[in-house]
Amino acid sequence: MTPELGNFALVLALMLAVVQSTLPLYGAWREHAGMMAVARSTAYGQFAFLLLSYLILTAAFIQQDFSVAYVANNSNTLLPMMYRISAVWGAHEGSLLLWVLILAAWTVAVAAFSRSLPLEVVARVLGVMGWVSVGFLLFTLLTSNPFDRLLPAPAEGRDLNPLLQDPGL
């Protein structure tokens, strides 16, 4: 059930990214302050849902939920906790989710620290950042979903790439 919540949080983040990429740009074109003001709140919401999704994936690794294909392919019951947590970004799907989360964090930074700029400029910048998020989130959900299920769940996972099992990484 919990991995479905992570997937649902990704879908909600995508919906907010679509709103962030369209309404503020349309509002800037029509000089509608209300539509432009939506940019900041959608940026905050998108970050919140992506953070929730990332934390749910991390919890799946900690709890060794092998019904999640990404967890089953990159962890096992003998893997130490430190490597289970770092395995979250140890392969394609997790690193892409981390990348989208970092992108959303930068979007929040732009939204938070651009108060002195004209609203039209902020709306255009956040709108373009929304389009970038839409692209990455669509790619994540359609081709690299870290919450794909593996049913029935195996009793043991495959293990993290041995090259990544180093304290320096």
Feature map (PLM): residue ranges:
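Polytopic transmembrane helical bundles with strong interfacial aromatic enrichment
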Residues: 1-169
